[in-house]
Swiss-Prot record:
Keywords: Sporulation. One of its GO terms (biological process) is asexual sporulation. Residues 1-49 are annotated as: Disordered. This is Small, acid-soluble spore protein O. Induction: Expressed only in the forespore compartment of sporulating cells.
């Protein structure tokens, strides 16, 4: 499995009707900087760390 993020969700574009609540648009591109502990846990697959 290559890239898991949905391809139709483009950061910087406006949130269209297809990108409603729950598509991961708001969670994925929230621009808050991560703390060090969160950055450590940021990888989706622990197996590859």
């Amino acid at each position: 499995m290559g890239k898991r993020k949905a391809n139709h969700i483009v950061p910087g574009m406006n949130a269209a009707s297809a990108q409603g609540q729950g598509t991961g648009y708001n969670e994925e591109f929230a621009n808050e900087p991560l703390t060090a502990a969160q950055r450590q846990n940021n990888k989706k697959r622990k197996k590859n760390q």
